[in-house]
Amino acid sequence: GLTRFQVTIGEVDYFRGLCEEAGLDENTEKELRSCISGKNFFAAQELLEQKQIPEPYHSILLKLADMFENIESLEDAKSLVKNERSLQAIARLEKLRKRLEQYGVAEYITFDLGMLSKYQYYTGVVFKAYTYGIGDAVVKGGRYDNLLRKFGKDTAAIGFVIVIDDLLEALSRQKVVI
């Protein structure tokens, strides 16, 4: 199997709570999500300036790209907000990190609070898995509690997709025989 991989975990509620705290309307949040998820920080900066988002929120929202990889960044992220939604998101990630350490897999995990999906139905944790030999994620997924309500079932859910073609290509490049 694969031995060289990395799973990146984000938390949509951190971003949503921060947007609420900053007073962003729904359309601005949607546009900003698109900019940040596409790593288009020039567009994000332009949008925040255009909408006259005040400090410290202007800087904090742009800083999402830097809140990546280590637990110190989670501590930094916690210190930047006052709202309960964002603080709870960080608490969930810290709890998850501790559990992953207990299982001995923390070395394969990074955190990225700037990892936002263009799909607005995600409500909490989002994740992507990468491996050597492929430039894009081979696994993508997250939590989407409200999506099933649209189909008549009000329940929490989490799901993911495995990009089989990319995974098989990675296995081939890594000379993993299956």
Kindly label every feature range from the protein language model.
Residues G1-R4, K30:
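Class II aminoacyl-tRNA synthetase-like tRNA-binding/catalytic domains
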Residues I9-G17:
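Short, conserved phosphate-binding/catalytic loop or strand-edge motifs used
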Residues G1-L2, L47-I178:
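Positively charged, Gly/Ser-enriched RNA/tRNA-binding surfaces
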Residues T8-G10, I36-N40, Q88-A89:
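Short acidic alpha-helix initiation/capping motifs at coil-to-helix transition points
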Residues G23-E46, I53, V105, T131:
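Acidic, His- and aromatic-enriched active-site or binding-groove loops in soluble protein domains
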Residues R16-C19, R33, Q45, K78:
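Amphipathic alpha-helical segments within well-ordered protein domains
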Residues E20-G23, V125:
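Short low-complexity, flexible loop/linker segments enriched in glycine and/or proline
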